């Protein structure tokens, strides 16, 4: 995955300060996954949010402005991810994508789930057989227009 220079700076500062995305959520007032998407340049922040991020990381104020610019979303390379965790999501969509699409169409009709009017949350669910990862996606349903 190609990582932008600013992302490298933000992540290095985050590591050096020992700050988690959850810590940044409390400081910025936005969900930790959304903050991670700003840092990885897949979302843009308001000026106030960007300033809170760079201040919390102890970085120069001029690094806030680039975080407010709408990024080129979905531009991570290569097309098929090689990172094992990211690949699992690719694999999940390969296996369950068409069945999930069929269920969505059955419940809502012909359309798509928005990735703009959208949220995603990651939670840890304790389990005696090994902790589980719970990912909840919530997107507005957008029916296809007929004309």
Swiss-Prot record:
**Catalytic site positions:** 88, 91, 114
Q: What class of enzyme is it?
A: lyase
Q: Name one GO molecular function term.
A: cyanate hydratase activity
Q: What is its EC number?
A: 4.2.1.104
Question: Sorted alphabetically, which keywords does the UniProt record give?
Answer: Lyase
Q: Could you tell me what reaction this enzyme catalyses?
A: cyanate + hydrogencarbonate + 3 H(+) = NH4(+) + 2 CO2
> In its UniProt record, which GO terms are filed under biological process?
cyanate metabolic process
Instruction: Cite the InterPro entries for this sequence.
Output: Cro/C1-type_HTH, Cyanase, Cyanate_lyase_C, Cyanate_lyase_C_sf, CYNS_N, Lambda_DNA-bd_dom_sf
Pfam families reported in the protein's UniProt record: Cyanate_lyase (PF02560), CYNS_N (PF21291)
Taking the record's annotation, the residue ranges forming a coiled coil are none
Tell me the domain of life: Bacteria
The protein's matches in CDD domains, at most eight in alphabetical order, are given as: Cyanase_C, HTH_XRE
Q: Which HAMAP family match?
A: Cyanate_hydrat (MF_00535)
NCBIfam families membership: cynS, PRK02866.1
Similarity remark = Belongs to the cyanase family.
Describe the task this protein carries out: Catalyzes the reaction of cyanate with bicarbonate to produce ammonia and carbon dioxide.
What protein am I looking at?
A: Cyanate hydratase
Give the species.
Answer: Acaryochloris marina (strain MBIC 11017)
């Amino acid at each position: 995955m190609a990582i932008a220079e600013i992302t490298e700076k933000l992540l290095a500062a985050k590591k050096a300060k020992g700050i988690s995305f959850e810590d940044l959520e409390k400081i910025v007032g936005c969900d930790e996954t959304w903050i991670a998407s700003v840092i990885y340049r897949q979302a843009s922040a308001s000026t106030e949010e960007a300033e809170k991020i760079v201040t919390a990381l102890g970085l120069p104020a001029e690094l806030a402005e680039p975080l407010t610019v709408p990024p080129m979303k979905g531009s991570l390379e290569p097309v098929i991810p090689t990172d094992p965790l990211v690949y699992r999501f690719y694999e999940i969509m390969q296996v369950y994508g068409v069945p999930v699409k069929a269920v969505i169409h059955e419940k809502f009709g012909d359309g798509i789930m928005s990735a703009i009017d959208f949220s995603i949350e990651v939670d840890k669910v304790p389990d005696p057989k090994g902790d589980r990862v719970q990912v909840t996606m919530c997107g507005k349903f957008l029916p296809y227009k007929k004309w």
